[in-house]
């Protein structure tokens, strides 16, 4: 925005292609800022016990599959292969659909961020009777043992010298952990530097 203003003041001609490029950057930055603000607000509500979930019976297999497939084009544009696999066709879970979608988007988006072109992201669902396991596994750069315990910390930016793992504000993963906890579930990561990471969500079928 400031760059365009400066160019206009100097009466510098901007080609339509350049203008479109600058506008795309502005849109992305605006989206990131709005996402950060929303995460800050939600984080505050959760910490103050004022965040309310709207739980209904949902087919978790359909919910996760649709969420992941909606990201398919974005993932493949990065040159990354996407695999979705489940050992159960249908599984009803009492949950807030919007917030579970949000967690899946956060985890898959995180996997994309740290997986190079030619890599693989695999999302799987396993039936554990009274629970369900959702896994987002990537062939990315991985996380060291030392940094695993920090990955869900609020505002933490994980930096591993050997893997150069950067986690931005860290709020996306923090919010995901908080939301899964509100569902009575658990979320954790298994990872090896240079091999990849696997973020695992365990959700109870009924958590009222």
Name each model feature, range by range.
Residues 28-33:
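Short alpha-helical segment of the dimerization/phosphotransfer core of two-component systems
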Residues 44-55:
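Helix-loop junction within the histidine kinase core
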Residues 54-59, 76, 81-91, 128:
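Conserved catalytic submotifs in the C-terminal HATPase_c
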Residues 80, 184-185:
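Conserved glycine-rich
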Residues 143-157:
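Short conserved segment of the HATPase_c
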Residues 156-167:
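Glycine-rich ATP-lid/hinge loop adjacent to the conserved G-boxes
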Residues 172, 176:
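Short alpha-helical Gxxx[C/S/T] motif in the catalytic ATP-binding
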């Amino acid at each position: 925005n400031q760059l365009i203003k400066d160019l206009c003041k100097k009466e510098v001609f901007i080609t339509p292609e350049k203008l479109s490029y600058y506008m795309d950057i502005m849109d992305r930055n605006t989206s990131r800022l709005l996402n950060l603000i929303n995460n800050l607000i939600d984080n505050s509500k959760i910490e103050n016990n004022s965040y309310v979930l709207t739980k209904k019976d949902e087919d978790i297999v359909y919910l996760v599959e649709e969420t992941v497939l909606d990201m398919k084009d974005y993932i493949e544009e990065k040159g990354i292969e996407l695999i979705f696999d489940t050992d159960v066709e249908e599984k009803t879970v009492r949950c807030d659909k919007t917030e579970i979608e949000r967690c899946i988007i956060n985890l898959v988006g995180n996997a994309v961020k740290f997986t190079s072109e030619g890599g693989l992201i695999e999302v799987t669902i396993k039936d554990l009777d009274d629970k369900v396991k959702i896994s987002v596994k990537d062939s990315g750069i991985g996380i060291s043992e030392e940094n695993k315990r920090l990955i869900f910390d609020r505002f933490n930016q994980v930096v591993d010298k050997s893997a150069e793992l950067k986690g931005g504000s860290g709020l996306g993963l923090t919010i995901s952990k908080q939301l899964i906890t509100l569902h009575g579930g658990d979320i954790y990561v298994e990872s090896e530097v240079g091999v990849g990471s696997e973020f695992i969500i365990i959700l109870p079928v009924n958590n009222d």
